[in-house]
């Protein structure tokens, strides 16, 4: 058993061990390990996040103090948003001189990231459900002046019914009225332009809740395309792309999506934060509203007849399209297999299984970039790197 896999001493964490039995590791962070655990009185399964505030003895006293304060702040925010159906629920907390134990609901479906890896890309319908729930969470957070600062598919969990639960509030903070942030933290490919600018310009006024909306746009783009909107093998060039808002809807996947969904993505990925969509504005976008209207509409007899008539017309059109459609020949498949949607999805799925990573299909597209995000990446010296 490695040091990372070793469990905290049962004597120093007696209260935790009296109530819970830790099991296998589910995930790791820079200074934490997440394990499945069993609540002894009820035999209920939970997930426990074990945070080593000493970094295994490698942290300085100042770093230990900062991590302890950050963990207490995370616990405080989780308690303030407790009860929201799409936010992970904190069940129990335990503290020793060296460790924190945070007990959460166990999400057996795992991360949205893993689901995307399996599915390659998501449909507009699936994306709509996920993004609506995420935006409702962000609305709640922002009304409380809480900014998450680390929104990404890895921090969105799924329950058995495919409902999302936002997790990992380690970078979150509650702003005072008029307060602006300057700390550079987050995951590189999800960073908003103003966060990067803060690291390069001492006179920058700082950033606010708008950074969450940029990350939301990156998430939505990634769910639909299967790859992030901003990527370059050299990180500083990728950060340049972010700062200039240089992205495209150029990959073949976008041919299958509506202009409405592309419009919403573009409303998030706006370089100037004051012009970026808020969560409330996004929920009022036609991408969501057109389906809300349909959900509450009551059918009248006339409406039922109209549906039947349209169904008959659609059936006739499908029949004639079927009679006219050109067969897919061997030559077409050999010449451009990626132009055919079923083959495209099949190729993507098997490429991952064969090579262990997604296959790059263009200069601006690389699914392997999804796997380059290290947990809890803190960027402290962007300004010192060469352009």
Curated annotation (Swiss-Prot):
Q: What is its EC number?
A: 2.7.11.19, 2.7.11.1, 2.7.11.26
User: Start and end of every Protein kinase domain?
Assistant: 20-288
Keywords tagged on the record: ATP-binding, Calmodulin-binding, Carbohydrate metabolism, Glycogen metabolism, Kinase, Muscle protein, Nucleotide-binding, Serine/threonine-protein kinase, Transferase
In terms of InterPro entries, this protein maps to: Kinase-like_dom_sf, Phosph_kin_gamma, Prot_kinase_dom, Protein_kinase_ATP_BS, Ser/Thr_kinase_AS
Gene3D superfamilies in the cross-refs:
Phosphorylase Kinase, domain 1, Transferase(Phosphotransferase) domain 1
Q: Which residues bind ATP?
A: 26-34, 49
Q: Name one GO molecular function term.
A: protein serine kinase activity
Its cellular-component GO annotations read:
cytoplasm; cytosol; phosphorylase kinase complex
GO annotations under biological process?
carbohydrate metabolic process; glycogen metabolic process; signal transduction
Annotated region (Calmodulin-binding (domain-N)), positions in chain: 303-327
Q: Which domain of life is it from?
A: Eukaryota
Residues the record marks as active site: 150 (proton acceptor)
Q: Name one matching Pfam family.
A: Pkinase
Reactions catalysed according to its record? 2 ATP + phosphorylase b = 2 ADP + phosphorylase a; L-seryl-[tau protein] + ATP = O-phospho-L-seryl-[tau protein] + ADP + H(+); L-threonyl-[tau protein] + ATP = O-phospho-L-threonyl-[tau protein] + ADP + H(+); L-seryl-[protein] + ATP = O-phospho-L-seryl-[protein] + ADP + H(+)
Q: Where is this region: Calmodulin-binding (domain-C)?
A: 343-367
Q: What is known of its domains?
A: The two calmodulin-binding domains appear to act in concert to bind a single molecule of calmodulin and are pseudosubstrate/autoinhibitory domains.
Stated family? Belongs to the protein kinase superfamily. CAMK Ser/Thr protein kinase family.
Job of this protein: Catalytic subunit of the phosphorylase b kinase (PHK), which mediates the neural and hormonal regulation of glycogen breakdown (glycogenolysis) by phosphorylating and thereby activating glycogen phosphorylase. In vitro, phosphorylates PYGM, TNNI3, MAPT/TAU, GAP43 and NRGN/RC3.
How is the subunit organization of this protein annotated in UniProt? Hexadecamer of 4 heterotetramers, each composed of alpha, beta, gamma, and delta subunits. Alpha (PHKA1 or PHKA2) and beta (PHKB) are regulatory subunits, gamma (PHKG1 or PHKG2) is the catalytic subunit, and delta is calmodulin.
Designated name of the protein:
Phosphorylase b kinase gamma catalytic chain, skeletal muscle/heart isoform
Species for this entry: Homo sapiens (Human)
- The gene for this chain is PHKG1
